[in-house]
From Swiss-Prot:
The lineage of its organism: Eukaryota, Metazoa, Chordata, Craniata, Vertebrata. The modification Phosphotyrosine is found at residues 1031-1032. GO terms for biological process: cell differentiation; cell surface receptor signaling pathway via JAK-STAT; cytokine-mediated signaling pathway; growth hormone receptor signaling pathway via JAK-STAT; intracellular signal transduction; protein phosphorylation; T cell differentiation in thymus. This is Tyrosine-protein kinase JAK1. It is found in: Endomembrane system. The gene is jak1. Residues 32-416 form the FERM domain. The active site is at 1000 (proton acceptor). One of its GO terms (molecular function) is metal ion binding. Its cofactor is Mg(2+). It catalyses: L-tyrosyl-[protein] + ATP = O-phospho-L-tyrosyl-[protein] + ADP + H(+). CDD domains: FERM_B-lobe, FERM_C_JAK1, PTK_Jak1_rpt1, SH2_Jak1. InterPro entries: Band_41_domain (IPR019749), FERM_2 (IPR035963), FERM_central (IPR019748), FERM_domain (IPR000299), FERM_F1 (IPR041155), FERM_F2 (IPR041046), JAK (IPR051286), JAK1-3/TYK2_PHL_dom (IPR041381). Residues 435-540 form the SH2 domain. Possesses two phosphotransferase domains. The second one probably contains the catalytic domain, while the presence of slight differences suggest a different role for domain 1. The protein kinase 1 domain is also called the pseudokinase domain and has a regulatory role through the transactivation of other JAK kinases associated with signaling receptors. It comes from Danio rerio.
Length: 1153
């Protein structure tokens, strides 16, 4: 080597040595406060002093600094490198004068192959509606939108470089020199990518980039140290080879293929996934690990791990979930080399070895129901109650682990749910309270509004996808389409600004302290936009497991929407009648009889097809031949149970058709129904026992919710006890049985009888049966469990039960506030506000921690039949008689004009004393009656300390037939009139079956609910008759509707059931004349008897009737129908047709129309 060159090299070495000494002598100044550092070279750290900050708030500030969008913000977290600790989003940093914390802002939640360049792993994307539609239609389309925005990709690239160089992502281990050489070349290839990216991003010339930049800055420190140990000539050769390769790469590959910065980043990061170990994975090394499972026959069993759970590690991986394995020995090769072969084949073998490296999958994120943290111990619960318990070395590590699983759950399963209250982000908690979504895109907001019915004033709240301090309110507005002359929905977006002062609608001046207060203010205003006026009416809050662009999807995890099972798709195992033996009668279900039974073993030839090797005790639910009309609904229940496979649901063996009977064959569960089991116990059941039952039930319902399946009748009598757990060994074990006959085929009376288990919306319309109905039922069942199987509302009549819902009453809840809150969240009258079953399980565990004391006897519920005078708001008079009047009122206890309309009957002041007994009698009668063709009793309202009373009834806005028929004559045909007649007869037949006679049946007292339904009203003259007498003698001197009365009523003042039949004949005459005043019964009879008044009217009327004169045949009335009317007007009561025969005759006529 020439002397000059040697001297020059010597000077360079001296300069390096001086710089190194100077760096060693430099003492950094001690930092104060809290600093957040970034990996982007041009981004200065954030500094915070004396205050309290949550990790989530700090992450928002960091995201703003790095221009990361709100959509990608939840991929990041704060990391303290010196402690190797990630902080949970709700962690509070208390910064004082003595605080010195250095944090790094890092992407924590990572999904390998997010770039989609690997042909081996499933691609990752954000969900889109087009993807959702393609799944529904089984079409193959392009995947959804990219996971990362541009700023997140830039940051991940910088973070990836930092991790690669510092060894935070160590390269995969090697065994041979050849493998080591291959790794070394790949690392130099990474340096080529990094230097090229550096040159292009800084507008430096690509040619000669290697001469200006040393490759040593872009390879791992460990490799640098290895190269330094080699001789000088080897280092020179490596440097020259690298420069030549870099120049060739830049001059040919980059320029010829038009490769940009994005391509370089993706190639760098995708290579990092295969070159290193641990990218996208976090590994925890607990002091102790337990994995347990639960079975029916025995308590929870710990899976054999050995070493008492020590020596194990747990991995959390974004694309698969949670796994565990035994720690590998220090000298054991865990992940072997990436083979030298073709790229795809090599990657496949490498990935296979990674999968085969001893990891046992515990759970994917969608299988997790909740997480519990106690000190340093974290317990993860799956839907099947299998658990993993990690005992970590300190609590911060436990919180970090829980926050990691919780974060991945929100990214892959439900963006608006948290698994653990100890690490719940405050933003998620507040969003749930406010009914606000995360930063979903406009496409999903509009899609949701369409699903909700596109009602005007319906709106969706969502955080902005681009700005951190704005909430977007997307509202449905109705606009007239001038071309088609029809109203069409339009979707308008309004910005709500958030700031330290509160919330305000963008463009206005007034801030409100909370979002809820702002919305309450806006709902009272008339809003305008683009010449449209509208009012906010209903918010559409986030729903469990909603699909949106907030969710990260892979092909393996792609959700398959559950469709309602079609009749042709009904599926269950068939059992031959010879294979079952029917035993003793166990009781009755809804339209079924229940028997004990035996399922015989099948022949040897059938064993391989699911036969039974020995006799099995079963329960037989028999739908008799008299209910063949609901056989299909019965089979639907069986098909639903056949699709369920959960250890806390009863097993359905199959269905047997025996002659004309259909039989559901279910497993026999030892201790029978839960309600009876609880009532049988002589010693009080412990709170822990009750909570275990509640958790098991909620886990089964969570499983059904994930499968988009509705049970339909959750109650304690449909929960079976398989293990009593009274000896303290493992606790109870329950199974949810089938719901029986679906409510969709039950009568209204049967549905009302199921109050308070049936959800209120299902009482209104059984078509409203959804998963939300099961949540209401669970709330009621939890009440039963708390109170040892007591029956809620057991003393209430059907009308009172219905009123309980109409008044939106609640069951009396236990003293424990948290337990009461859980029940009311399940039993809110708005189905959209009910909790996700995962949230129910989580909250049960939280309440259980408090070990609440539950008093055995519940308090009395609020009586829904008692109305408070101050909440009755009169709207108008409906009618007036001699002694009383009826008013239309709104009962509005909330004072928000949302209360129901009711008809209020009261006595006139001058008649109160003498007529109060009659009004009380009418109240007592109405309380006893419940029929779809009789006006419903709602309650009473006491005034003046009880001296005055009001009768509250349902309001029917169409009025009486006397008013309705003349008004709608053009739209009402003979068939409709026949239908009305049938309904009146059905109501009167029911009245007679309860030993009542109406005494005032007329068109004026038949009210119209809708064009297809009428109801009998005004029971002011109704009397009760004794079974052995059959009639009632009137002793008072009330004004009577004489022209509707039968002769025996006019002559002897005796009233029979047949007397009501006479009045019905007159009423039918009114219907056929459409209540024309010119030919009303009074007008016709007055023409027959001539001018008269007082008692003489009754005398002359009796004479005309005794002569056989009757009302004439109305126009368009057939002879057959008129003959039926004449049979109602037989002179002697015994000869008159009865209501049952009238119903049959009308049904026959209807069939012939």
């Amino acid at each position: 080597m020439p002397e000059l060159a040697v001297m020059d090299l010597g000077r360079q070495l001296c300069v390096k040595m001086k710089k190194q000494r100077k760096a060693e002598m430099t003492i950094p100044t001690a930092m104060k406060g809290l600093e957040i550092h970034f990996y982007l070279a041009d981004t200065h750290q954030l500094e915070f002093f004396k205050a309290c900050y949550t990790a989530e708030d700090l992450c928002v500030e960091a995201a703003k600094r790095c221009r990361i969008s709100p959509l990608c913000h939840n991929l990041f977290a704060l990391y303290e490198e010196s402690q190797d600790l990630w902080y949970a989003p709700n962690h509070v940093f208390k910064v004082t004068d003595e605080t010195s914390i250095k944090l790094h802002y890092r992407m924590r939640f990572y999904f390998t192959n997010w770039h989609g360049t690997s042909e081996i792993e499933s691609p990752v994307w954000r969900h889109t509606l087009s993807k959702q539609k393609s799944v529904l239609n089984s079409q193959k389309t392009t995947e959804g939108t990219p996971l990362l925005d541009a700023a997140s990709l830039d940051y991940l690239f910088a973070q990836g470089q930092y991790d690669f160089l510092r060894g935070l992502s160590p390269v995969r281990p090697t065994q041979t020199d050849e493998e080591h050489h291959e790794i070394e070349n790949e690392c130099l290839g990474m340096a080529v990518l990094a230097i090229t990216h550096h040159a292009k991003s800084n507008n430096l010339p690509l040619s000669g980039a290697g001469a200006e930049t040393s490759y040593k800055r872009f390879i791992p420190d460990s490799l640098n140290r290895t190269i330094k140990q080699r001789n000088f000539l080897t280092r020179i050769r490596i440097s020259n080879v690298f420069k030549n390769f870099l120049n060739e790469f830049n001059s040919k590959t980059i320029q010829d293929s038009n490769i940009g910065l994005y391509d370089l980043k993706v190639k760098y990061l995708s290579t990092l996934e295969t070159l290193t170990q641990g990218v996208g994975r976090e590994i925890f090394k607990p002091k102790n690990l337990k994995v347990t499972g639960e079975s029916e026959g025995s308590p929870a069993q710990m899976l054999p791990l050995g070493d008492n759970g020590m020596g194990y590690e747990v991995q959390v991986y974004g694309t698969t979930g949670i796994s565990w394995r035994r720690k590998p020995a220090p000298n054991q090769l865990i992940l072997k080399d990436k083979p030298k072969s073709k790229k795809i084949k090599g990657d496949k073998q490498w990935n296979d070895k990674k999968k085969d490296s001893g990891w046992t999958l515990f759970s994917d994120f969608h299988e997790i129901t909740h997480i519990v943290i106690k000190d340093c111990c974290v317990t993860i619960y799956r839907q099947d109650n299998k658990t993993m318990e990690l005992d970590l070395f300190y609590r911060d590590a436990a919180l970090s682990f829980a926050a990691l699983v919780d974060g991945y759950f929100r990214l892959t399963v439900d963006a608006h749910h948290y698994l653990c209250t100890d690490v719940a982000p405050s933003s998620v908690v507040q969003n749930l309270e406010n009914g606000c979504h995360g930063p979903i895109c406009t496409e999903y907001a509009i899609h949701k509004l369409r699903q909700e019915g596109n009602e005007e004033g319906t709106y969706v709240l969502r955080w902005s996808c681009t700005e951190y301090n704005f909430i977007i309110m997307t509202v449905v507005c109705i606009e007239l389409d001038l071309c088609e002359s029809r109203p069409v929905p339009q979707y308008k977006n309004f910005q709500i600004e958030t700031s330290p002062q509160g919330y305000r609608l963008y463009g206005t001046d007034t801030f409100r302290p909370t979002l809820k207060e702002l919305l309450e203010h806006l709902q009272g205003q008339l809003l305008r936009t683009d010449n449209l006026r509208f009012q906010l009416r209903r918010c559409c809050p986030p729903q469990p497991r909603e699909i949106s662009n907030l969710l990260v999807m892979t092909t393996d995890r792609e959700p398959v929407p559950q469709k309602k099972t079609q009749v042709s798709q009904l599926s269950f195992d068939r059992i031959l009648k010879e294979e079952i033996v029917q035993g003793e009668h166990l009781g009755r279900g809804t339209r079924t009889n229940i028997y004990a039974g035996i399922l015989k073993p099948k022949s040897d030839d059938e064993d391989d097809l699911g036969g039974y090797s020995q006799e099995v005790k079963v329960v037989l639910k028999v739908l008799g031949s008299g209910h063949r009309d609901i056989s299909l609904a019965f089979f639907e229940t069986a098909s639903m149970m056949r699709q369920i496979s959960h250890k806390h649901t009863a097993l359905l063996y199959g269905v047997c058709v025996r002659h004309q009977e259909n039989i559901m064959v279910e497993e026999f569960v030892q201790y029978g129904p839960l309600d009876l089991f609880m009532r049988r116990q002589t010693t009080p059941l412990s709170t822990a026992w009750k909570f275990q039952v509640a958790k098991q039930l909620a886990s089964a319902l969570s499983y059904l919710e994930d499968k988009k399946m509705v049970h339909g009748y959750v109650c304690s009598k449909n929960i079976l006890v398989a293990r009593d757990g009274l000896d303290g060994e493992g606790g109870p074990f329950i199974k949810l049985s089938d719901p029986g006959i679906p409510i969709t085929v039950l009568s209204r009376e049967e549905c009302v009888d199921r109050i308070p288990w049936i959800a209120p919306e299902c009482v209104k319309d059984t078509a409203n049966l959804t998963i939300a109905a099961d949540k209401w039922s669970f709330g009621t069942t939890l009440w039963e469990i708390c109170y040892n199987g007591e029956i809620p509302l057991k003393d209430k009549k059907l009308s009172e039960k219905e009123r309980f819902y109409a008044a939106q009453c609640q069951l009396a809840t236990p003293d424990c506030d948290e337990l009461a809150k859980l029940m009311t969240h399940c039993m809110t009258y708005d189905p959209r506000q009910r909790l996700f079953f995962r949230a129910i399980v989580r909250d049960i565990v939280m309440v259980e921690k408090q070990n609440p004391s539950i008093q055995p006897v519940p308090m009395l519920e609020v009586d829904p039949t008692v109305f408070e005078k101050r909440f009755l708001k009169k709207i108008r008079d409906l009618g007036e008689g001699h002694f009383g009047k009826v008013e239309l009122c709104r009962y509005d206890p909330r004072g928000d004009r949302t209360g129901e309309l009711v008809a209020v009957k009261s006595l006139k002041p001058e008649n109160r004393e003498e007529q109060s007994n009659n009004l009380w009698r009418e109240i007592h009668i109405l309380r006893e009656l419940y029929h779809e063709n009789i006006v419903k009793y709602k309650g009473i309202c006491n005034e003046e300390g009880g001296r005055s009373i009001k009768l509250i009834m349902e309001f029917l806005p169409a009025g009486s037939l006397k008013e309705y028929l003349p008004r709608n004559k053009a739209h009402i045909n003979l068939k409709t009139l026949h239908n009305y007649s049938v309904q009146i007869c059905q109501g009167m037949d029911y009245l007679g079956s309860r030993n009542y006679i109406h005494r005032d049946l007329a068109a004026r007292n038949v009210l119209v609910e809708n064009e297809g339904t009428v109801k009998i009203g005004d029971f002011g003259l109704t009397k009760s008759i004794k079974d052995n007498e059959g009639y009632y003698t009137v002793k008072d001197d009330l004004d009577s509707p004489v022209f509707w009365y039968a002769p025996e009523c006019l002559i002897h003042c005796k009233f029979y059931r047949a007397s009501d039949v006479w009045s019905f004949g007159v009423t039918m005459y009114e219907l056929l004349t459409y209540c024309d005043a010119s030919c009303s019964p009074m007008s016709v009879f007055l023409k027959l008897i001539g001018p008269t008044h007082g008692q003489m009217t009754v005398t002359r009327l009796v004479k005309v009737l005794e002569e056989g004169k009757r009302l004439p045949r109305p126009d368009d009335c057939s002879e057959q129908l008129y003959n039926l009317m004449r049979r109602c007007w037989e002179a002697t009561p015994e000869k008159r047709i009865d209501f049952k025969s009238l119903i049959a005759n009308f049904q026959q006529m209807l069939d012939n129309l």
